[in-house]
Regions:
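Acidic/His-rich, metal-assisted hydrolase cores and their charged scaffolds
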Residues: 1-86, 105-169, 173-399
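Short N-terminal helix/helix-N-cap motif within the alpha/beta-hydrolase-1
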Residues: 97-98, 181
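Metallo-beta-lactamase
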Residues: 85-95
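Metal-dependent catalytic neighborhoods of phosphoester/phosphodiester hydrolases
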Residues: 98-104
């Protein structure tokens, strides 16, 4: 799947000159004990990108670059990046696609099919710049073999496996929740990973939250009991633009009710192409007690207004805030110890449903892969945090 020459010509025409801003950046490959492999002589496309990058207003962090390749991962806000002629997007969350707009014209964007559809319908990125890749299929992109693997994060999220001509293999996890299933991925089970870019969102021993399956079972149980005792209850699940779908899908399936969401969310959900999803969505909130709201809306004053907007059809509300940040060491894996917060006729449960790996899962994933080097991609701004994470990695790999 090589870049078409016609696209390159189009990029050349659309390039705009920007004021050059020079910033010094430490060679962090050295800081992490890595050698930055000397890439092969750049092709004409790379040279063009390198010249444009001279005017880039921000320096791209080293952990977003794939050494020995003209690739970056989730680095759109830094575009144009010097010597980068292909930009990879791991998934459709704003902190990863920031910098992408409908005017994007720097270079092709490689992502999964589902993410590609979201780029088009939500950000209106020109289809000519979007290169969708099938999960589990190997592609030759500029001489590098690239494979997308399911990341067990949000819909469309991918681990990206890069295999260089010199035999080196790199894995970028993007955001992911490590699972036993990943140990059966042929690429991960049979090939040594030389360099692992690791999602370290919860790389701290205090984060040992339960499995997604256990949390879903808890949420369904609470909902069932609540509706049995209070039939006129509206059930609200907080969610991101994409993400947390399994929470409300589990409730819907267990209770046999449809899902109400606004038109924008319904459009996004339908774009996933999941079997039966369209038939399971309601366009009228009066037809079902299960409603989806932005997770940022789960505040009592906002929920009170929402309840009042239902014109008396419901007399109480049960809401779920599903995020790993609600996890408490005191509760651990005993979800029955969770105490909801209530105000008037509204009850909110914070449940540790996370789409990122907990500390134990990170350890198991690293010990399964046994990579030569690990580069953390989250919480790396503080040298103390970096040092702690490196000590964890060393302990795991010695075991």
């Amino acid at each position: 799947m090589e870049t078409k020459r016609s696209d390159v010509e189009e990029w050349k025409k659309k390039k705009k000159k920007r004021k050059r801003v020079t910033m010094k950046q430490k060679n962090l490959f050295e800081l992490w004990g890595l050698k930055d492999p000397h890439p092969k002589p750049p092709d004409p496309d790379d040279v063009q990108q390198s010249r444009a990058a001279a005017a880039s207003p921000l320096n791209c962090p080293f952990y977003k670059k794939i050494p020995g390749t003209p690739f970056t991962v989730d680095a759109f806000r830094y575009a144009p990046v010097k010597a980068c002629s292909a930009y990879f997007l791991t998934h459709f969350h704003a902190d990863h696609y920031i910098g992408l707009t409908k005017s994007w014209s720097h270079a092709p964007i490689y992502c999964t099919n589902l993410t590609a559809r979201l780029l088009n319908i939500s950000l209106y990125v020109a289809p000519s710049f979007i290169c969708p890749l099938e999960l589990g299929t190997e592609y030759n992109i500029k001489g590098i073999k690239v494979t997308m693997l399911d990341a067990n994060h949000c819909p469309g999220a991918a681990l990206i496996h890069f295999r260089l001509p010199n035999g080196q293999s790199y894995l970028h996890t993007g955001d992911f929740r490590a699972s036993k299933l990943m140990q059966s991925y042929p690429l991960l089970a049979t090939q040594r990973i030389n360099l692992l870019y690791l999602d370290t969102t919860y790389c701290n021993p205090k984060y040992r939250f339960p499995s997604k399956e256990d949390v879903l079972e808890f949420v369904v149980g609470v909902t069932r009991r609540y509706l049995n005792n209070h039939p006129k209850t509206i059930v609200v699940v907080g969610a991101y633009t994409i993400g947390k779908e399994q929470v409300y899908l589990a409730i819907s399936q267990a209770l046999g009710v449809k899902i109400y969401a606004n038109a924008s969310r319904r459009r996004i959900l339908r774009s996933f192409g999941w079997a039966g999803i369209s038939e399971n969505l309601s366009t009228n909130g009066k037809d079902t007690p299960l409603h989806i709201l932005p997770i940022s809306s789960l505040r009592f004053e906002v929920l009170q207004r929402y309840l009042e907007s239902q014109y008396g059809q419901y007399t109480s509300m049960l809401a779920f805030r599903p995020t790993g940040w609600t996890y408490s060491e005191t509760i651990g894996e005993n979800l029955n110890l969770i105490k909801p917060t209530s105000k008037g006729n509204i009850t909110i449960y914070g449940v540790p449903y996370s789409e990122h790996s907990n500390f134990t899962e990170l350890q198991e994933f690293v010990q399964f892969l046994r990579p030569e080097k690990i580069i953390p991609t989250v919480n790396v701004g503080n040298p103390v945090n970096r040092g702690k994470m490196q000590s964890y990695f060393q302990q795991w790999l010695k075991a």
